[in-house]
């Protein structure tokens, strides 16, 4: 009679062990799920705060550029020179005065690399009379010029690009452009640009840390990349980014999973520029650090 009793005891012990193991496994899964959800939610909230700060700083730079453009646009000498309301013998005098005026404005900020006005009267002035322009005739073919014409009276912010209007200079910049127009009639008399050194944006974003592998990048509303830590690789088709998904997501987040692992993309769109700032966090890294 002892043998059946032992079998029953063994069966009960195995069943109890299985129950304990199963319960522990279920609890571990539940704990992991809740931990992961909590970590992901905290990560989204933290990333949103960082993005908001980055956007506020960028918007501040853009505001300054717009203020510069407005001061130039409303300057009486600029208005008179580009609307041809001064006698021919005074034009050289006005050229010098306006260049000095632009020089004084550009000198207040080291992040401004170029201020240029291209008038419909054929005149082109910059903050430095010594700058040699590549081809005045090619200026109307520049995208920043054309967009300013399309948005007459409104400011237009470009994505990052190489500015090549100055001979021998190929600077990465963010360009603000707008038309020079008569405040009374609204008639356009030319286009002005203010170039902000791209390094300002790059330094602002690159110093933000999202773990060991995470990163931030910025995309313009047309899908062009304003800043990305792997920008050159993307342009060379050596790496891809989920730009289409980002453009579909004005604000909020989405998750992608590929050969690089599972990642959370947190997106926020600036009402000021229309740019989307994106924070990318690696889920595995978040849970591991937890």
Which stretches of residues belong to each language-model region?
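Extracellular/periplasmic juxtamembrane segments that couple receptor/chemosensory ectodomains to their
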Residues: 222, 230-290
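N-terminal sensory and localization modules of signal-transduction and trafficking proteins
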Residues: 1-6
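Solvent-exposed, extracytoplasmic
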Residues: 98-107, 131, 184, 191-233, ...
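Short, hydrophobic-rich beta-strand element in sensory/regulatory alpha-beta domains
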Residues: 69, 112-117, 214-217
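PAS/PAC or PAS-like capping segment
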Residues: 180, 198-199, 283-284
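Juxtamembrane extracytoplasmic/periplasmic/luminal helical "stalk" adjacent to the first N-terminal
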Residues: 8-85
């Amino acid at each position: 009679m002892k043998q059946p009793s032992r079998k029953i005891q063994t069966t009960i012990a195995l069943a109890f062990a299985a129950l304990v193991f199963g319960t522990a496994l279920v609890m571990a899964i539940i704990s992991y799920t809740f931990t992961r959800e909590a970590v992901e939610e905290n990560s989204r909230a933290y990333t949103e705060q960082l993005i908001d700060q980055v956007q506020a700083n960028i918007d501040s730079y853009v505001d300054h550029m717009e203020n510069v453009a407005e001061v130039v646009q409303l300057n009486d000498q600029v208005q008179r020179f580009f609307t041809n309301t001064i006698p021919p013998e005074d034009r050289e005098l006005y050229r010098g005065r306006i260049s000095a005026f632009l020089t004084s404005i550009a000198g207040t900020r080291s992040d401004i690399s170029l201020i240029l006005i291209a008038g419909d009267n054929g005149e082109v002035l910059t903050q430095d009379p010594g700058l040699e322009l590549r081809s005045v005739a090619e200026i109307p073919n520049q995208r920043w010029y054309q967009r300013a014409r399309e948005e007459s009276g409104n400011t237009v912010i470009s994505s990052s690009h190489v500015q090549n209007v100055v001979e021998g200079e190929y600077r990465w910049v963010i360009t603000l452009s707008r038309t020079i127009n008569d405040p009374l009639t609204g008639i356009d008399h030319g286009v002005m640009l203010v170039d902000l050194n791209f390094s300002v944006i790059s330094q602002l974003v690159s110093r933000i840390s999202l773990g060991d592998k995470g990163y931030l990048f910025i995309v313009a509303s047309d899908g062009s990349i304003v800043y990305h830590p792997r920008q050159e690789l993307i342009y060379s088709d050596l790496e891809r980014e989920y730009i289409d998904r980002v453009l579909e997501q004005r604000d909020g987040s989405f998750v992608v999973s590929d050969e690089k692992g599972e990642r959370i993309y947190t997106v926020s769109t600036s009402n000021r520029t229309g740019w989307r700032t994106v924070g990318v966090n690696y889920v595995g890294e978040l849970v591991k650090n937890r």
